[in-house]
Amino acid sequence: MPAIYPSYRKNSSLSFHKLYRPAQKILPKTPVLQSKGDRPLKMNFEDQLKALIFYHLEEHSSGRHLVQVLKQDDFARRHIAPEDGIEKSSFFEAVNSRGLEQLQFVYRNLCQEVSVVLPARYAHLGNLTAIDGSLIDAVLSMTWADYRKHSKKAKIHLGFDINKGIPAKLHLTDGKAGERPFVSQILDPGRTGVCDRGYQDHVLFDSLQAEGKYFIIRIKANTVIILVRQNTIPTGSPVFYDAEVLLGSDQNKTQTQTPLRLVAYRINGTDYWIATNRRDLTAEQIAEAYKLRWEIESFFAWWKRHLKVYHLIARSQYGLMVQIYAGLITYLLLAIYCQEAHKERVSIKRVRELRIQIQNELREAGSSSDDYFFKEQHHDRLYAKI
């Protein structure tokens, strides 16, 4: 039975409501969040979702910082926190044990909405998904996050929609887990996975072709190449090799079973060897598509820095997934907001403008006293409330 959510009980700033509205529209369809015992929930799912969005949007430094703000900040207490407030123990219990199914549901539905709202760039290259992994520093008590002796790390395996500029599918593992097994799980048929050299795997190349999935993956320059057919190379192009080949040694049982295309080009003295089964693109377009792989690197850097996604508020694998999905949802909401308000992609300039705009609207409405608008944070910067 779908959850039934009453209209939101507290008035918020117009800008915050505009940001939050796409998620709010999904709530009536969201699976019901139920208590696992006889005790009533201290936070319903909407409370949990809003608190986590608030955490990422306002760059709180820790979960304790967020709980303190939910208690002491006038706006957060009245507009973000549960009706009866929230204690630290109840907040962390909720994050570590509840809400993941609901967050995943909201995330999937937001991805569908974003795919309609955002224009597609690079349409001439087809649907491109950059795939990469990112390590998250963990603490020693997170025993599941195995990495190496005296060090704990978790790893996100993420697919990033290059055309839309948004994250797509993800998986979370310990830091030692390999990245190649997740390519097929992340990539949908008809899409093209764009990966660096760490994903070179000749068995993977064969299986992706058998599954009707495409790839543009850089390989090592010393890979054994068996020429099947040479393709024409345009004059004056940075491309110096374009052919149908088999990769690997039959003697060592590493050879691909299905021929693929191999394109090589030189940029600023560096040679790039790209394995692909995209035969509809020119060699120069293959080079262009591989260059776009850096968009996932840029996303990870921006996401970590400006939404504080890797400032852990949970230590269980479940809780970390809750935090990651909340960070992704926040990013998608910002993507929709920036497109609708400015016809632009997400940028820190627009995020800062949003924070200040929300603050100004609350001041004008007289929703809280000036004492609550200025909080000491890190380098005594202006603390913009939402």
Over which residues does each language-model region extend?
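Short Lys/Arg-enriched helix C-cap and helix-to-coil transition segments
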Residues: 101-113
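Extended, structured, electrostatic nucleic-acid-contact surfaces
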Residues: 71-81
